[in-house]
Amino acid sequence: MEIVGKKSQGLSITTLDEDKTVIVSFNDRSLNFYVTDSLKESLKQTINTKIDEGFVHFVLNLENVKIIDSCGVGLIIVANNVTASRDSKLYLCHIKPFIIKIFDIMRISKNLSIYDSEEDVLEAVKQS
């Protein structure tokens, strides 16, 4: 596992070479105004670097995220746009129900691939 950024406020990156999949976990419990500026650049750079290395599936594991604001939602939208523009796919997993409700209210759920667990995402990747 690779850590990008400060351990307490960064991203943990796990690569699954056989599936061409990158799992990105957020180390902080908050995706809000205070952390998203630094995370946005780290996340974009990580996605672009891994795409250049041949990876095509990206999983954002939100298991640790307990707080999210509009900046955090924007971070997820940026990740979705970066992967889509580079012919790759973004998946989200371990999302708290209140975050899904926020996505529903903002009407972005239909544009996101949301799964319950990493295992569910990996099964979907294998079937794609």
Regions found by a protein language model. Name each.
Residues 113-117:
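Short acidic-hydrophobic, aromatic-tinged amphipathic segments that line or gate anion-handling sites
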